[in-house]
Design a protein with these regions (language model features):
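Flexible, low-complexity linker and terminal segments
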Residues: 1-151
Length: 151
């Protein structure tokens, strides 16, 4: 049975608005506490990068290859790949605010970029989105990221 909520005090079913408010906040606090147990966000590449490439999920390999290629060809880039997104790692805001240019590369319509904007205000995020049903093509990533660096 779903959709039932227990009383904060007795554990019995409750439909009271005040109790609902308490329970919503209690559940959110439990999720937020998970951040104490997940690893911090790591950045690969140049510490003083001109562009931070951000990804999550199954995009790691293609984005890492793009970063490695660009660095080998003299571009100052870095790469952060999120393994946890709710909650975000505790150092997410500190890491992202270090970079003037950030590109979030996703194989969807950009939901993670929007989520980051909501969770970390003040970011200047560019997006590279593809909805092809196929993995990224590394050459396309390199071309798009190089163009961003030149802007």
């Amino acid at each position: 049975i779903g959709g039932l909520e227990k009383s904060n005090e007795t554990g019995a079913i409750s439909t009271e608005p005040e109790n609902h408010n308490k329970m919503v906040h209690l559940r959110q606090a439990k999720v937020d506490k998970i951040a104490d147990y997940i690893p911090e966000l790591e950045v690969l590449g140049d510490e003083d990068a001109d562009l931070l490439i951000v990804g999550w999920g199954g995009t790691y390999g293609h984005l890492r290859l793009a970063m490695d290629y660009m660095r080998e060809h003299g571009k100052k880039v870095a790469f952060a790949h999120f393994q946890y997104i709710n909650p975000l790692p505790k150092n997410t805001a500190d890491v992202l605010h270090k970079y003037k240019k950030i590109v979030v590369a996703e194989q969807n319509l950009g939901q993670f970029a929007g989520y980051l904007r909501m969770k970390v205000p003040g970011l200047n995020i560019s997006q590279f989105n593809q909805v092809k049903g196929q993995p990224f093509v590394t050459r396309e990533l390199i071309d798009a990221f190089t163009k961003l660096l030149e802007e």
